[in-house]
């Protein structure tokens, strides 16, 4: 999320570029009033505007960056993103239920937020992460990769963001937040109230699924994070 991107993450849906993004990725119904609507997600990603800043200088959350990562995975593996996810993560993690992923009208997988998964399976993946990528099948996720985003590191780009409301002493790397709360607590956050919260020192893994009306509500987040921290504090 430190890529120089002019994308506007506007969950109110007022920004033109956000409307284009959601329409061309199949997340919203196609808005006929949008001019020059991209022909699918790949077309949209290929024409993302720059913010004018140098890469690696400022944190800027942008969902299309995650979609681009999914596209990179497809190019590197010569396979569909959902196939890679299934073969390398879901099957060896012994997930119990079917999962779904959003496709654009041309069949491209939306890796930014188009995956729906059962609570039990989400907890399984979260616990796998807490256990440094290993289960009874052996090592599924490289431990070094998990340690890279769990352990504190330079957070100057994160602190340079325009509106630092979430985790003022934290950081963001590899799609996970370092909370800055101590004990190396880290988490993943989705819109409408989805959370994974991990306290490795207390061997605590929490997931939260929700259908909150607001895509983002910082006050509600702060309340839930306080609850997660207190659960950890109660553990010896």
Residue ranges of predicted features:
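Short, gly/Ser/Thr-rich active-site loops of penicillin-recognizing serine hydrolases
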Residues: 216-236
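Non-transmembrane alpha-helical segments in soluble domains
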Residues: 1, 42, 46, 70-74, ...
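Catalytic-site signature segments of enzymes, centered on catalytic residues
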Residues: 12-106, 110-113
């Amino acid at each position: 999320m430190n890529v120089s991107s002019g994308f506007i993450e506007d969950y109110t849906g007022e920004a033109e570029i956000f409307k284009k993004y959601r329409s061309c990725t199949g997340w919203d119904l196609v808005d006929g009033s949008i001019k020059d609507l991209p022909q699918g997600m790949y077309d949209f990603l290929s024409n993302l505007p720059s913010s004018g800043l140098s890469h690696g200088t400022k944190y800027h959350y942008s969902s299309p960056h995650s979609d681009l990562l999914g596209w990179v995975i497809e190019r590197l593996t010569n396979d569909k993103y959902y196939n890679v996810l299934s073969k390398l993560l879901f099957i060896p993690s012994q997930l119990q239920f079917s999962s779904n992923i959003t496709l654009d009208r041309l069949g491209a997988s939306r890796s930014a937020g188009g995956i729906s998964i059962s609570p039990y399976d989400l907890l399984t993946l979260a616990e796998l992460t807490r256990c440094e990528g290993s289960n009874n099948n052996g090592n599924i996720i490289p431990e070094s990769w998990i340690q890279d985003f769990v352990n504190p590191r330079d957070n100057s780009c994160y602190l340079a963001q325009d509106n630092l409301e979430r985790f003022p002493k934290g950081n963001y790397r590899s799609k996970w937040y370092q909370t800055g709360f101590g004990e190396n607590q880290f988490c993943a956050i989705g819109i409408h109230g989805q959370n994974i919260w991990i306290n490795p020192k207390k061997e605590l893994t929490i997931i939260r699924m929700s259908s909150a009306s607001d895509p983002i509500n910082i006050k509600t987040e702060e309340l839930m994070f306080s609850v997660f921290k207190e659960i950890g504090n109660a553990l010896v």
